[in-house]
């Protein structure tokens, strides 16, 4: 998944789908830069991370 860092991605959780620029993937968190600001998503909530299609 490190190949997605710096790219526009979709991060899906059970509750929400986030779209933004992937900044960092750690053992505990995913850091995403969105239009609304920075979002930190706990890894245990992440169901899927994929590159956003045009």
Language-model features: locations:
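Conserved RNA-binding domains used in RNP assembly and mRNA/RNA metabolism
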Residues: 1-54
